[in-house]
Regions:
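Active-site region of PLP-dependent enzymes
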Residues: 29, 157-163, 170-219
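Phosphate-binding glycine-rich loop
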Residues: 30-74, 88-92, 98-100, 165
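PLP-dependent aminotransferase class I/II
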Residues: 34-39, 47-50, 111, 115, ...
Length: 219
């Protein structure tokens, strides 16, 4: 007898159902529940600020927009990647430059990154893929040497650490996703941008809401 195994499945109970009902009875706009969630995820990534959006893909677009790179700048990314990581680069009028992956870990081959760096290179957009993480210590060292920004695409990973230190400590901006098949889900979709840079956070907040920064709680 064949058994159907789904790619991703949401698991929730009465606690989650009650929380949704409570929120619906209050407001469907961004309020205290969103702020609490943003703060909890930011803490997981060792970041000061978290900004909820509709998807991890949108979080990547915001990350690139707030960094405000010149048109035509190059962003290094691994060739094994998710489509929206590449499309976010192109939508920002930037050029993706691909680096091969390690055949054992499926993560970006850090030994090949520097060969791809040019005068136009501005950032490294690197994911934690398929339950594994790249050599973030080495990536950070390369970024500092060449004065590059780091964007961590952690859509597949939530709370990863290296020697009890969050992978988020190595990035300028991290993002994660709450799509239906990811670690936790926001009823099918959702994402968050995370940073320690207040200017990045405030710019992203304006871009998220058509030029407005206000929520139901403050601002």
């Amino acid at each position: 007898m064949q058994k159907k195994i789904s790619y991703g499945k949401n698991v929730y109970g009465r606690k989650e159902i009650n929380a949704v009902i409570k929120t619906l009875n209050q407001s469907t706009q961004m309020g205290k529940s969103v702020e609490t969630f943003e703060n909890k995820i930011a803490k997981l990534f060792s970041k000061k600020y978290g900004l909820m959006v509709n998807s991890g893909s949108s979080a990547l677009i915001l990350a690139l927009k707030v960094m405000n790179f010149p048109k035509g700048s190059e962003i290094i990314a691994p060739c094994l990647n998710f489509g929206t990581a590449v499309s976010s680069i192109m939508l920002s009028n930037l050029n993706p430059i691909f680096v091969d992956c390690d055949i054992e870990t499926l993560q970006i081959d850090t030994d090949k990154i520097e060969n791809k760096i040019s005068k136009k290179t501005k950032a490294l957009l690197i994911p934690n893929l398929i339950g594994n993480i790249p050599d973030w210590k080495k990536i950070k060292k390369i970024a500092l040497k060449h004065k590059l920004k780091i964007i961590e695409d952690s859509a597949d990973t939530l709370g990863a650490t290296i020697n009890k230190r969050s992978t988020g400590t190595y990035s300028d901006i991290s993002i994660t996703s709450f799509y239906g098949s990811h670690v936790i889900s926001c009823a099918g979709n959702g994402g968050i941008m995370l940073t320690n840079d207040k200017n990045y956070y405030l710019r992203a907040k304006v871009l998220r809401s058509w030029g407005r920064m206000s929520t139901l709680i403050k601002d």
